[in-house]
Swiss-Prot record:
Belongs to the class I-like SAM-binding methyltransferase superfamily. Cation-independent O-methyltransferase family. COMT subfamily. GO terms for biological process: biosynthetic process; methylation. This is Probable O-methyltransferase 2. The lineage of its organism: Eukaryota, Viridiplantae, Streptophyta, Embryophyta, Tracheophyta. Expressed predominantly in root hairs.
C-alpha cells in the first residue's frame, strides 16, 4: 500500500528560498575548489608572513600573481571569507574587496606552513587529499555503485572504481603522488589535537606504566607528545613495516612492525586513535579482540583507549554536519564508517569487553575507555 501523500504547496518566498538552497547544495563543490586554490597558492602562509593581515593588492604582490588577477582573487577571497575560512575587515557584498583587510582565523591558521607550535599540525595535505581527482571521481560514481549487485564484503566506491583500496600498499600502484598525499593528509589529521587530549583528558594516562599506540600514520608524533607529558610511561608504537621505514627516528618510543589483526604488543593499555573508522564493524571486532588479549584485567588497570568521531548532534548542527561528511568520506573511500555511541557499544560487546566509559567529548571526537 502506498504511503499517504501530503501535498506540498510552497509559498512564493519558500520557492525562491528553495531555489537558493538548491544552488548552494549543488555548488558547494566550488567552495572546496576555492579552498584548494588558496592552499595551492599558499595564501594562508602569505597572510601569516605579512603579519597576519593584508590587503588584496599586497596579497597579489606577495603571491607574485599577475595584477590582472586581482579582481578574480578578490572574488575567491570573498567566498572564502563568507565560508568562514578567512576573516576580513571591510569586505562586503558590493565588490569592494580591494579595500578589505584579510586576516587569518583558527581554520586558516591550520593551513599556514612552518608554524612553531605544539598544537599546530599543517593540514594542507588533508585538503589536497579530500579534493583530489581520485576522491572526487569516487564520489561521482556513487549512483553507479548503488546500482551494482556486488558480492560481500562490499568494496567501497573508491575501490570499485579504481580497482585498489585507499590507504593500502596497492594505492601506490594506482598513483604514487596520491598515496603520498593521502599518507601525509591522514597523518596531519590524526595528530591534530593530541595536545588538547593530553591537557583535557590527562586522567586516561595517569598511573599507566606501559602503552601500545596502534597504527597511526606517523604515530610517533602523538606517542612522543604523550611520553613528553608522562615520561614514566613505556610506549611502543605498532605499525606496518612501510610506515615505520619512512617514519622519522625517535628515541622516546619503541617502534614494532606488526598487524592489528594478528598480534598486539602487550601493555597495560592499548591506544587506537582515529584507526577504527577505516574498518568495517566485523574487522573492528577482530582488532579489539586482539587488543583485549594484549592487556591485563581491569583490576590491574587494563584498558583500551579509543579516540574516534562520536556521531551525534550533541555539539550542534554545524559540528554534526561535519561528522556526517566525515562518515560520507569513509563510505565513499573505505569500507569503514563513523559511529554512534550505540554502534560502539555493540562492537565492544561482540569483542568481549565488559564495560566502557566516554571520558570526554572533544569537538567532533569522543575519548573512550573500554574495559576487559
Amino acid at each position: 500500500m502506498a504511503a499517504s501523500s501530503h501535498a506540498i504547496a510552497p509559498t512564493d518566498a519558500e520557492l525562491l528560498q528553495a531555489q537558493a538552497d538548491l544552488w548552494r547544495h549543488s555548488l558547494y563543490y566550488l567552495t572546496s575548489m576555492a579552498l584548494k586554490c588558496a592552499v595551492e597558492l599558499h595564501i594562508p602562509t602569505a597572510i601569516h608572513n605579512l603579519g597576519g593581515a593584508t590587503t588584496l593588492p599586497d596579497l597579489v604582490t606577495a603571491l607574485s600573481l599577475p595584477k590582472t588577477k586581482l579582481p578574480f582573487l578578490g572574488r575567491i577571497m570573498r567566498l572564502l571569507v563568507t565560508s568562514g575560512i578567512f576573516a576580513s575587515d571591510g569586505a562586503n557584498g558590493d565588490g569592494a574587496a580591494a579595500e578589505a583587510v584579510y586576516r587569518l582565523n583558527p581554520l586558516s591558521w591550520l593551513l599556514v606552513e612552518g608554524v612553531e607550535s605544539e598544537d599546530h599540525t599543517y593540514q594542507k595535505y588533508f585538503v589536497l587529499a579530500t579534493v583530489s581527482q581520485h576522491y572526487v571521481d569516487a564520489g561521482l560514481s556513487l549512483a553507479d555503485w548503488f546500482r551494482k549487485d556486488l558480492p560481500e564484503p562490499l568494496p567501497s566506491p573508491f575501490e570499485c572504481l579504481h580497482g585498489v583500496p585507499l590507504a593500502h600498499e596497492s594505492t601506490k600502484l594506482l598513483d604514487e603522488e596520491l598515496d603520498r598525499i593521502v599518507e601525509e593528509g591522514v597523518a596531519a589529521h590524526d595528530n591534530l589535537a593530541i595536545g588538547t587530549i593530553i591537557r583535557e583528558c590527562s586522567d586516561i594516562f595517569s598511573g599507566l606504566h606501559s602503552l601500545t599506540y596502534c597504527c597511526g600514520r606517523q604515530g610517533n608524533i602523538s606517542a612522543t607528545a604523550i611520553i613528553k607529558a608522562f615520561p614514566d610511561i613505556k610506549c611502543t608504537v605498532l605499525n606496518l613495516p612501510r610506515v615505520i621505514e619512512t617514519a622519522p627516528a625517535d628515541d622516546a618510543v619503541s617502534s614494532v612492525t606488526g598487524d592489528l589483526f594478528h598480534t598486539i604488543p602487550p601493555a597495560q593499555a592499548v591506544m587506537l586513535k582515529l584507526v577504527l573508522h577505516f574498518w568495517s564493524d566485523e574487522d573492528c571486532v577482530k582488532i579489539l579482540e586482539q587488543c583485549r588479549k594484549a592487556i591485563p584485567s581491569r583490576e590491574e588497570g587494563g584498558k583500551v583507549i579509543i579516540i574516534e568521531i562520536l556521531l551525534g548532534p550533541y555539539m550542534g548542527p554545524i559540528m554534526y554536519e561535519a561528522q556526517l561528511l566525515m562518515d560520507m568520506l569513509m563510505m565513499v573511500n573505505t569500507r569503514g564508517r563513523q559511529r554512534t555511541e550505540n554502534d560502539w557499544r555493540q562492537i565492544f560487546t561482540k569483542a568481549g569487553f565488559s564495560d566502557y566509559k566516554i571520558v570526554k567529548k572533544i569537538g567532533a571526537r569522543g575519548v573512550i575507555e573500554v574495559y576487559p
